[in-house]
């Protein structure tokens, strides 16, 4: 069974809370340049088997969504999202700032239905003038949705 879950609908694991208590009074460098990020970078380099990898951490979801979506799409592509999708309603224009269009399709209780996506793609591909349109290059799906579904 596939289960797409998030970190917002449960409390922290007791070991995480304990570690926060243990390190609460520590003074470290700023985020990305502290001993914990340095240790994480080393582990990522080991996992990637690349001692020269450049590792950067992002501090929030908006920055992450904008960076990842921009890195995936070509300049002529956009991202399909339901009209109520997080990137369309609560990302403060960050996707558009990267010069990519959010291509809206209707939501059903906050979710993207496969038949809606299939219908959109069939119509897009059948359009003889689609070379003048933003091409869909990515589909954005979230859980939970903005409606909590």
Summary of predicted features, one role per range:
Residues 3-6, 55-59, 81-82, 141, ...:
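General beta-strand structural signal in soluble alpha/beta enzymes
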Residues 8-11:
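Short polar catalytic/cofactor-binding loops
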Residues 13-61, 83-88, 94:
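Conserved N-terminal alpha-helix of the aminotransferase class I/II PLP-enzyme fold
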Residues 47-50, 72, 94-97, 129-134:
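Solvent-exposed alpha-helices and their adjacent loops that cap or buttress functional pockets
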Residues 54-73, 103-110:
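Conserved core of the PLP fold type I
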Residues 71-89:
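Conserved PLP-anchoring active-site segment centered on the Schiff-base-forming lysine
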Residues 99-149:
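PLP-dependent aminotransferase-class I/II
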